[in-house]
Amino acid sequence: MKGLIIIGSAQVGSHTNALSKYLKGQLGEHDVEVEIFDLAEKPIHQLDFAGTTQAVDEIKNNVKSLQSKAMEADFLILGTPNYHGSFSGILKNALDHLNMDHFKMKPVGLICNSGGIVSSEPLSHLRVIVRSLLGIAVPTQIATHDSDYAKLEDGTLYLEDNEFQLRAKLFVDQIVSFVTNSPYEHLK
């Protein structure tokens, strides 16, 4: 079983990235192969977090890589920071390079992090997009806050909150169950 986590944050080492790494570890306990596609590290938009323009060839290669990995994946997880009550433009740009063939009847997990007011609104917006792309958004979603994380001595963030660790377990179990017991395989 293969999964792809797409991180729509412009910041390297983001809270969304920390949550994605935590989920990758949890999925690994189910012998699931997971790749994280962090758009801060592999940009497909024109400007990076520092405001510099990426080389056109680099963008094209990143788009091809994203499309290939999404096609190979049995499930996807979309991760975003909460940007003004919605998901990031960077994630929207990435999704614009994918189509129904990448999502059709695949389980899709939704995660986000808020620095300010905790909100699941970005996930509600993504849920509509997943449905439009014929994906199946799993019922459990994760919306964290910066305060749910702690830092290691080197500054690396990690999910510290026990409640969200339990929610992450349910989230992972649902994704694995949807892939393993898919009643929609014949519709792909």
Swiss-Prot record:
Keywords: Flavoprotein, FMN, NADP, Oxidoreductase. Transmembrane segments: none annotated. GO terms for cellular component: cytosol. GO terms for molecular function: FMN binding; oxidoreductase activity. Its cofactor is FMN. Its EC number is 1.7.-.-. SUPFAM superfamilies: Flavoproteins (SSF52218). InterPro entries: Flavoprotein-like_sf, FMN_Rdtase-like_dom, NAD(P)H-dep_reductase. Belongs to the azoreductase type 2 family. Catalyzes the reductive cleavage of azo bond in aromatic azo compounds to the corresponding amines. Requires NADPH, but not NADH, as an electron donor for its activity. Homotetramer. This is FMN-dependent NADPH-azoreductase. It comes from Staphylococcus epidermidis (strain ATCC 35984 / DSM 28319 / BCRC 17069 / CCUG 31568 / BM 3577 / RP62A). The lineage of its organism: Bacteria, Bacillati, Bacillota, Bacilli, Bacillales.
